[in-house]
Amino acid sequence: MKLRFLVPCLALALFSIAAHAQDNPSPVNPSTASYIDVGPGDVGLYVNPVGIHITNSQPDTGPFAFLGDNTTARWFWGANIGGYVNFYHHPKYDAGIDLRDSIVSGNNARLNSFLVGGRIVAKPIAEKFKPYAQLSIGLGSSKPPHSTVHLNRFEYGIYGGLDYTLAKHVDFRAIELGYGSVSTVSSGNFNGTTSFPNSRLFSISGGLVFRVP
């Protein structure tokens, strides 16, 4: 399945999970005050700008050099398209899943990352600030600047951020920082004699999150 088809699948999966939880709510246990349910504001959707600083300790050359000839670091820019569902609720935090498709490019190279992960968000601090963290895994598809080939490899990412409530259904994502790793395309994948380590991904993002329903 091509990654471009995963975006509508992402939205469908989120709404399916939310609908199932709403149809099958768990009663609140007074002794623990923890419960599973999806209520108003527990589903969030976002399309936010992102910058990813991609580094690799081993320089590469030729048409399959992902970062460019003899280059070990480069900024890539693009967008995070995704959403989350918080379905587990505790007096001190909420937890759920986040699905995202991160599409970035730089120097005519491209990285497309489809990630699924668990997230935990603290109850609002000072009523409106909501710090969160998540661990995601998935598939990273990289394309070098001078070739049409794509390499699909396992990718992981660790993220932390801060959302601020602007309105009933709108949050401002003040910042999200991330660190991840993926094996990007290189000359070593095409009969090259040099092996290349995974590329490291340092990301920064922000924008708006629309909470539904």
Segments from the language model and where they lie:
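Outer-membrane beta-barrel translocator domains and adjoining extracellular loop/strand segments
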Residues: 56-65, 108-114, 143-152, 184-192
